[in-house]
Amino acid sequence: MSEAEARPTNFIRQIIDDDLASGKHTSVHTRFPPEPNGYLHIGHAKSIYLNFGIAQDYQGQCNLRFDDTNPVKEDMEYVDSIKHDVQWLGFNWSGDIHYSSDYFDKLHDYALELIDKGLAYVDQLSPDQIRDYRGTLTRPGKNSPYRDRSVEENRALFASMRQGEFAEGSACLRAKIDMASPFMVMRDPVLYRIKFADHHQTGSKWCIYPMYDFTHCISDALEGITHSLCTLEFQDNRRLYDWVLDNITINVHPRQYEFSRLNLEYAIMSKRKLNLLVTEKIVEGWDDPRMPTISGLRRRGYTAASIREFCRRIGVTKQDNNVEMAALEACIREDLNDRAPRAMAVIDPVRVVIESLPMGYEQDIAMPNHPNRPEMGTRQVAFSREIYIDRADFREEANKQYKRLVLGKEVRLRNAFVIKAEHVEKDPQGQITTIFCRHDPDTLSKDPADGRKVKGVIHWVSANRSLAAEFRLYDRLFSEANPAAAEDFLSTLNPDSLVIRQGFVEAGVPAANTGEPFQFEREGYFCADSRYFSPTHPVFNRTVGLRDTWAQRAAM
C-alpha cells in the first residue's frame, strides 16, 4: 500500500470530495503559508503533510507562500530553512515560491477601496488606547473618536502614513465593522501599521505593512486557492476573512476550514518560548536535537518518512487533543528497525581480558548488518583478547533474573564465544577496572557442545580495533507532559535531557555519513551528528531507545 493510499479520510477530505462532486470546484489548490520568523517545528509538519498531501492525492496544486508582513521579525535565514524543511519532508510546491510581499501594491489598492467605501479609517489612538477601546469578552468596545473621518481625510492620512510622516504606533488603518460584535476580531481590526524597517524582499519601499488577517485572505484569492486550511485558533478570524473578501472587488472567494493544531506532550510549540530556549542558551540552537523543530528532529536522526507516518496516524480532527510523545517515538522506532544497519558500541565501557586466549589474538567475525534483511549483507568485526563490554552488563553478585555476566558464571558475547568471569581488578576507590575471563573455544557463534544453556547475550567491541567515540544520549526536554501549562515552563526542564558519554564503537562505523542511522545493538537507534561528527572524532546522537522507557517509568 502506498503512503497516499494509507492516508485516512477526514472531514476536510470529505468537504473536498463533496466540492468536486457538486462541481463547485474542478480542481484542488491549497497552500502552506508560514511566517519566516523562526524554524518550522513538528506542528508545522502536520500542516505541511495535510496541505501538500491533499494536493498530491487530488492531482492538484499546493503553493508555498511566505507570510512576510512583519519585517522586524523576519529573515532570509528562515526562508531558506523553511524551503529546505519542506523539501526534506518529501514535498514540492507548485510553480514559483510566493511571498505575501508580492502583493503589497495590490493590498494597498484594496485598502484604498475600503477607505473609499467608508469601510476603513485612519485611527490615531495609541496602541494601549486601542486595546482599551476594544473592550473584553463581557464588555462591548466603544468607537474611536477618529472613526467617522471623511473618505478624503482618511485617504490623505493613509497617504501620509505611507510617506513616513507618522511615527510608529501613532497611526494605523482600521476596518470599520462593529465595535459591539461578540467576536473580538470584528471590533474594527487593524489592517495596516507603521514599521520603519527594511524588508527582505522589498527593501525600503514600504513603511506601512498589512496585518495578517487582511493579507491572508486576499493572497489566497489572488492565488486561486480553493481550500484555505488553518488551525483552530483562526476559527473566529474566518469572519474577518470573509468580510474582507465580501467588501473588495475580487473575483475569487476561497473558503477557510479549521483543524486542530498539534499538541505534543513533553514539548512546546510556541515560537516565543522556543526562541527563549535558544537565546538563553538552554539549548545550543534551533537544531538542537531536543528541540521539536524539523531541523532538530533531523539532526537527532528522525527520518522524513517517520514524521510523515506520524502525521498520517494522528489524522485531522476539529477537536484539540494532546498527542503522546510515545506516538512520535514509535514511528521512528518502527522506521529505523526496518532500515537501520546494526552495529556494536559500548557506551559505558569496562575492560575485559580473556586470559585463555593467547597474547595478541585477533579474529574477524562475520556479522549480519540486519537480522531480517539478508540483502543488506554482512560485515567483518574484529574480535580480540581484550574487549570492552558495558559496565551495566557485569555484576559481582546477582539474582537469577540477571541474564548478563556475573562473577563465576557464563554469558555469550554477541556472535562470538561464551565467556566466564573469573576475577576482577579494582582501582583504589573500589571501581572495577578489568574483568578477567576464560572462553569456551568450541562456542564461536554456536551453542556449547555439552548441551549446557547459556541464556544471556551481551554486546562488545574489540579493545584493539575499536574507535573512541562520543555518545549524546538525548531524552525529552521537559519532565512534565504539559510544560506550557506550568507557571514557569522552564521549571519543568528535564535535567537529564542530555547525557554525554565517552565509549567505543566498532571500527567500520566512523566512516558513516552524517545523519546516517544505526541500531547500536541493545542500546538504541543512533545517528552520526551533523555538527560535530568526524571520522577521527565520531559523535553519535541517540535518536530513540529500543523501547519506551518513559512508559515503564510511569508504571513504577
Swiss-Prot record:
UniProt-annotated binding residues for L-glutamine: 67, 212
Gene3D superfamilies in the record: Glutamyl-trna Synthetase, Domain 2, Glutamyl-tRNA Synthetase, Domain 3, HUPs, Ribosomal Protein L25, Chain P
Annotated EC: 6.1.1.18
Any single GO CC term annotated in Swiss-Prot or TrEMBL for this entry: cytosol
Motif 'KMSKS' region, chain ranges: 268-272
Location of this chain's protein in the cell: Cytoplasm
Pfam families assigned: tRNA-synt_1c, tRNA-synt_1c_C, tRNA-synt_1c_C2
Gene Ontology BP term (one): glutamyl-tRNA aminoacylation
Catalytic activity reported: tRNA(Gln) + L-glutamine + ATP = L-glutaminyl-tRNA(Gln) + AMP + diphosphate
Family statement: Belongs to the class-I aminoacyl-tRNA synthetase family.
NCBIfam families in the record: glnS, PRK14703.1
Subunit record text: Monomer.
Protein name listed in UniProt: Glutamine--tRNA ligase
Protein's organism: Sodalis glossinidius (strain morsitans)
Lineage: Bacteria, Pseudomonadati, Pseudomonadota, Gammaproteobacteria, Enterobacterales
